[in-house]
Amino acid sequence: MTKSAKIGVLLANLGTPDSPTPKSISRYLWQFLTDPRVVDLPRCKWYPLLKAIILPLRSKRIAKNYQAIWTEQGSPLLAISRQQKDALQAYLDTQNINAQVEIAMTYGNPSIQSAVKNLLKNQVERIIVLPLYPQYSSSTTGAVFDAFANALKEERGLVPFDFIHSYHIDENYINALANSIKVRLKSDEFLLFSYHGIPLRYEKMGDYYREHCKQTTIAVVNKLGLTENQWGMTFQSRFGREEWLQPYTDKFLESAATQNIQKIAVICPGFSVDCLETIEEIDKENRENFLKNGGQSYQYIPALNVEHAHIEMMGKLILEKLA
């Protein structure tokens, strides 16, 4: 391809607080938990509960977790996202694509709104939105679409855009996952695929996230040639009292040893960037959970982050839209 009209690329992810303090985290959680895509309870009931109980308690507890993983460059999610941006920009440059890549967060900073403004200020003639959620869910990819649409509402001129809905069975994505696992998985380890959960009620309302997770898992399992007793699939990070997608990751790990699973490797294919939910919850809390309940060894297989195959996959998704 030759250089022509300038395109804008939005690498969209969930977001992060600006600092690991209760105040900053409370502000971030308010934005996150008041999005009806995430929590669809009646506002008259949800908001008072959120303000009076949930935010004060969760902000203090989560602050300690963030402080344990915070870096000089900010949260791991933000630091790695910046690296992804630079790497994707470099890849597109090698493909002779006239592009400007921006990272954009649904909640927190840099916001999707500010990223869109940056692109339009630099006179891009087309925008490609890539939510870094391989498996579609209304509460993640759907929320990115809402935020992007709201950002465009403020503009009189509507530039053409493409929105990448999902890539859960994209060949390059599956190969990147399989290769990442292959170089780390030991022959005697059980492989657990852990995905972020959603309320079961959302699935009953039409969200097909679980099916996307299954399709990703089966594609990777087939690529690796694993047998039925060598792998499992669970869902993590639930909160609140209602039922979420099951089986739950923490409950599975508590009882794994009783199922003769002594050595385990956990991968989280739905996370494109390592963050609080993988570093603290999976690599620390669930490691402790598994080992204290009779497990012998536990390894967390990192997110694809800035692996070359991951960046190349992103680039090829962009190139497909330009073909």
Curated annotation (Swiss-Prot):
Localization in the cell: Cytoplasm
Signal peptide: none
GO biological process: heme biosynthetic process
Keywords annotated in UniProt: Cytoplasm, Heme biosynthesis, Iron, Lyase, Metal-binding, Porphyrin biosynthesis
GO CC, any one term: cytoplasm
Binding site for Fe cation: H196, E277
Pathway this chain belongs to: Porphyrin-containing compound metabolism; protoheme biosynthesis; protoheme from protoporphyrin-IX: step 1/1
MF-aspect GO terms: ferrochelatase activity; metal ion binding
Listed Pfam families: Ferrochelatase
Catalytic activity: heme b + 2 H(+) = protoporphyrin IX + Fe(2+)
Keyword Calcium: no
Main enzyme class: lyase
Enzyme Commission number: 4.98.1.1
Source domain of life: Bacteria
Role summary: Catalyzes the ferrous insertion into protoporphyrin IX.
Classification via NCBIfam families: hemH (TIGR00109)
Family of this protein: Belongs to the ferrochelatase family.
Name recorded for this polypeptide: Ferrochelatase
Organism whose genome encodes this protein: Haemophilus influenzae (strain PittEE)
Gene it is expressed from: hemH
